[in-house]
């Protein structure tokens, strides 16, 4: 679904010092991300600490961000769960709130079969009018959604795309070759964005775009317009920063980076912990080589 945008940021969830959600800061961050190149935002995905944000907090975040953003950009609600019924109910609530689409992660922990994955996503998609984006991230879910399952699901009209974070480029090529023409493939890994664009993917659902969104957007637009040399140069330039943002589990590094740069997003909820000094020093050193696109003040 091309109108959701080529550059979508998987947004962190800001917390106050007491650990509660900072809805006002989430709104400020959302607007800053749109100002720095993002076409849309994923709210309460992996980067938004979805496992430790309650359903009530999720719904309030969907509403707060959508209220702030309005028609300036797309709001994609992270409504997935490893219970089909819970994911369905969460998606229907997000639809009532008025978000633009939903992101549905492969069910984690319970290790469904490929048929189970197909029925899980089919059940949710057929119950909502929202555009649904599949999210394949086997490094977190253990279960890998096969290309055949994605291709099969792409025949359901409101399953409009997939965030592919498996890193399996051969599988991704198979998907791109066999889905319907308007089915959209986004990279789910910042480091895979340019390679996947070269294979026919549309864009990226990004973490690094919190701080270098304009540069990632330029890389994408350069590639699309045929200036592949510039796109490749930007990709190479951003690689060390991207590496530092994933040196430990996301969103630990990006939250540290934002706080260090002066955009307060608070801490993390257990069992996630804040960056230790070794990690923090690595991130600080990496940031020295980059222009920061996010408006900080």
Curated annotation (Swiss-Prot):
Which positions bind pyruvate?
47, 205
The record's listing under CDD domains reads: DHDPS (cd00950)
Instruction: Report keywords, A-Z.
Output: Amino-acid biosynthesis, Cytoplasm, Diaminopimelate biosynthesis, Lyase, Lysine biosynthesis, Schiff base
Q: Which GO terms describe its cellular component?
A: cytosol
Output the InterPro entries linked to this UniProt entry: Aldolase_TIM (IPR013785), DapA (IPR005263), DapA-like (IPR002220), Schiff_base-form_aldolases_AS (IPR020625), Schiff_base-form_aldolases_CS (IPR020624)
Tell me where it mainly resides. cytoplasm
Pathway per the UniProt entry: Amino-acid biosynthesis; L-lysine biosynthesis via DAP pathway; (S)-tetrahydrodipicolinate from L-aspartate: step 3/4
Q: Which PROSITE patterns match?
A: DHDPS_1, DHDPS_2
Which top class of enzyme applies to this chain?
lyase
Protein's cellular compartments: Cytoplasm
Going by the entry's taxonomy, the superkingdom of the source organism is recorded as Bacteria
Q: Which GO terms describe its biological process?
A: diaminopimelate biosynthetic process; lysine biosynthetic process via diaminopimelate
One GO term in the molecular function aspect is: 4-hydroxy-tetrahydrodipicolinate synthase activity
Q: Give the EC number(s) listed in the UniProt record.
A: 4.3.3.7
Q: Which Pfam families match?
A: DHDPS
Catalytic residues? 135 (proton donor/acceptor), 163 (schiff-base intermediate with substrate)
| Catalysis: reaction(s) | L-aspartate 4-semialdehyde + pyruvate = (2S,4S)-4-hydroxy-2,3,4,5-tetrahydrodipicolinate + H2O + H(+)
Q: Where is this site: Part of a proton relay during catalysis?
A: 46, 109
Assembly description: Homotetramer; dimer of dimers.
Family named by the database record: Belongs to the DapA family.
Q: What does this protein do?
A: Catalyzes the condensation of (S)-aspartate-beta-semialdehyde [(S)-ASA] and pyruvate to 4-hydroxy-tetrahydrodipicolinate (HTPA).
What is this protein's record name?
A: 4-hydroxy-tetrahydrodipicolinate synthase
Species this chain originates from: Dehalococcoides mccartyi (strain ATCC BAA-2266 / KCTC 15142 / 195)
Q: Which gene encodes it?
A: dapA
